[in-house]
Amino acid sequence: MKRRGFLRLLLGGAAAGALGPWRGEALGATDFRRVRPADAGWPGANAWKALGQQLRGGLARVDSPLAAGPVSPELLKQMENPYFVGDQAWATQSSGWGGAWSSKPSAWAVSARTAEDVAAAVTFARKNRIRLVVKGGGHSYQGTSNAPDSLLVWTRPMDRIVLHDAFTPQGCAGKVGPVPAVSVGAGALWLHTYDAVTTRGGRYVQGGGCATVGVAGLIQSGGFGSFSKRFGMAAASLLEADVVTADGKIRTVNACTDPDLFWALKGGGGGTFGVVTRLTLRTHALPETFGAVLLNIQADSDAGYRRLIERFVAFYKTALFNPQWGEQVRFGPRNRLGIQMLFEGLDKAKAEEIWRPFLAEVEKPDSGLRIEPGRAVVSFPARAFWNPEFLTTKMKDHVRSDPRPGAPANNVWWASNQEELCIWWHGYESTWMPESLLADARQKDLAAALFAASRHWSLSLHFNKGLAGSPPEAIAAARETATNPAVLGAFALAIIAGGETARYAGVAGHSPDETEGRSDAQAIGAAMAELRKLVPDPGSYVSESNYFEKDWQRAFWGNNYARLRRIKKKYDRDGLFFVHHGVGSEDWSADGMARLRS
């Protein structure tokens, strides 16, 4: 199924030095600096050897073959495989962002296999004043899973998945009843987790849509998947987590034990409050069916396209604005409407019945609209949706498989995500669209804004990433997360973004096009400006947002930020954990190496 890969995405601001209104201090004013490998305070060989001897996993220097001179065609081919990329300590799923960051490996990496390995790495970094980086799936668009001159805590080997028929969080006996759940190591990926929970276990767990996204990072950012309109945010399903905090302590946190830290892990941002080593998530009863409606509609004029957008907005409000429908619709600059909607709990006949009134209008001889070849309505048993055998046989045109000899059979990914692999971002922005825009009196304003934005750049509405229209219990659970409360009243998340696939800074013949990047950034910014006229004070989803967002504290967390800031000071007063635009990052230089004086 096509996912967010098919759109061309965004950028609103272009000042690489924009650090936000909460950071007004001079960058040179500091009372603490971390050390780099060339500094006298950097640990010597014996210190690194001693660290390695503490580990059940491994410790190694990290070098990128992309920086070692001419890059072989064989390596570039391997980089087309997200599982290969994820298996390299030096690599990240995005390669950089123009004017912001480029992927650079850490100096050393701890390949963690246990929470004790993580604790040893955290303690070593704290005592030696070393910049610490955490990477599981490595999907951060903001570059938070890589940094030069750092120690990487690489959790990828921690990928164990265990199903529970009845799970009670530690210390919660007698306070909450046992529920079906799944415990997942911090290095597990979502496709593997779905395969275990749904294919083999016959249950559903709310996770992300991209197969190779890491479970831990998604939960800590809030997290949405194709069926979040029904089951809510991924973070809202968190029952318990094991986390190593800055003091090196391994904590088991839940609503009964360290509830403030537990809350912060549910959407407060990854790599900020500690290193998560294990998560336990509530599982849900599996719907009977999943399915999709896929089609593209071409309008023969601007006026016809505006009418088409108006019709779709009205149709969405009356027929699709409910828990059964998720995913997205794309509005293109060439008067093309791309529909990639997923549903749950319906058969094919019912899905076709729901869409029949809208399509009847589109297919009228005088409509000025044309449905392109390839229209499809499909429905299948939900238990098959992440079954590798089903995907690679019945949906082989929509998926790709890991071609490496001996690769696990469930190393599968959506083909439409291919263009995001090793992407060099020109920009990315998002904004939650409030439900009030669907009111009859506002629908024409919404349609006009979508049309105006599409004149500059393609944009998508991700209906599964707004919780308005969800069941009350899903909204109530999301209210107990740290994510910006704007999500609760939003019917969709609008995304505008773009970049170049398989581009690598400094690699001859494969470097990003800076001129194209600047042009794209301007167009993306202009498109978002059209939506800002309609939604002047929106929230933004932390994982899919503008690197240069100035008011990031409010945009990502709204009025939850003050509480997150207090929790950060409680568990990481010295700021060991730093990520770009993470909670508390306003106290540091842009590279996280120097603390700023308040």
Which ranges hold each PLM region?
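Soluble FAD-dependent oxygen oxidases
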Residues: 2-598
